[in-house]
Swiss-Prot record:
It is found in: Nucleus. This is Ethylene-responsive transcription factor ERF015. Residues 26-83 bind DNA. The lineage of its organism: Eukaryota, Viridiplantae, Streptophyta, Embryophyta, Tracheophyta. Its main location: nucleus. InterPro entries: AP2/ERF_dom (IPR001471), AP2/ERF_dom_sf (IPR036955), AP2/ERF_TF_ERF_subfamily (IPR051032), DNA-bd_dom_sf (IPR016177). The keyword Signal does not apply.
Length: 187
């Protein structure tokens, strides 16, 4: 029997990394990048093409994006990561099939609409509801930017971009302006 090749530190470290990733639940259509982001994409049946669904901070968000895209493509017949979750709302009254951009937009909004907390973070609330409407195709970039900016905050259901980013919020409170003695105490 020939002698076995010497063990390489590169092989053992790559196997170690693969083992560490297994502590997270695996989801369909989701993989972890080497720098820690979770990415999602879906294959279109019978064509072999892929639709990029984005990169996310948590595997659950990437899995929800995949579920939304799967629902757009296969309807109720798909095998979902979260089968009991409410499905995304598709645009009403559309006679044309959904485009790649439509599917990406629906997936991004759906992934950001409910935040699932991993089982190892039990001190936080289980879900956070954020309104998710599918924007018109001309407002996709603006809507995506707002969704990304307010994704981690609790918002009232009637919040708008204007009320979230108002000029009044950038001014100091009136009690700070009147009580300046505390500044003199610092000096």
């Amino acid at each position: 029997m020939p002698p076995s090749p010497p063990k390489s530190p590169f092989i053992s470290s790559s196997l170690k990394g693969a083992h560490e990733d297994r502590k997270f639940k695996c989801y369909r259509g989701v993989r972890k990048r080497s720098w820690g982001k979770w990415v999602s994409e879906i294959r279109v049946p019978k064509t072999g093409r892929r639709i990029w669904l984005g990169s996310y901070d948590a595997p659950e968000k990437a899995a929800r994006a995949y579920d939304a895209a799967l629902f757009c493509i296969r309807g109720e017949k798909g095998v979902y990561n979260f089968p009991t979750d409410k499905k995304p709302q598709l645009p009403e009254g559309s006679v044309r099939p959904l485009s790649k951009l439509d599917i990406q937009t629906i997936a991004t909004n759906y992934a950001s609409s409910v935040v699932h907390v991993p089982s190892h973070a039990t001190t936080l609330p289980a879900t956070t509801q954020v309104p998710s409407e599918v924007p018109a195709s001309s407002d996709v970039s603006a809507s995506t930017e707002i969704t990304e900016m307010v994704d981690e905050y609790y918002l009232p259901t009637d919040a708008t971009a204007e009320s979230i980013f108002s000029v009044e919020d950038l001014q100091l409170d009136s009690f700070l302006m009147m009580d300046i003695d505390w500044i003199n105490n610092l000096i």
